[in-house]
């Protein structure tokens, strides 16, 4: 199902579409949102891409495109649920968003 048909179905059912990008106002909120995605689904590349896309839309995709040197179209494509952004793109986008990736030791499953 496409994003458009999903929104049309939600509207027809009386639901108001929720856009998380409208609620990410500070870098702290953006970082917490990204951390939550990484914590809940660390192997979900599409989810990570979509979360970065949500944050980029909150900041303004035109501004992110300008700061990364990438086109808006390529950012929308890469930062979607179907996207598979390169690591270089992820680093450029996180920098443009004022965020930083960091590593921590994972719990060892036994």
Predicted regions and their residues:
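Structural motif corresponding to alpha-helix initiation and N-cap regions
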Residues: 17, 84-87
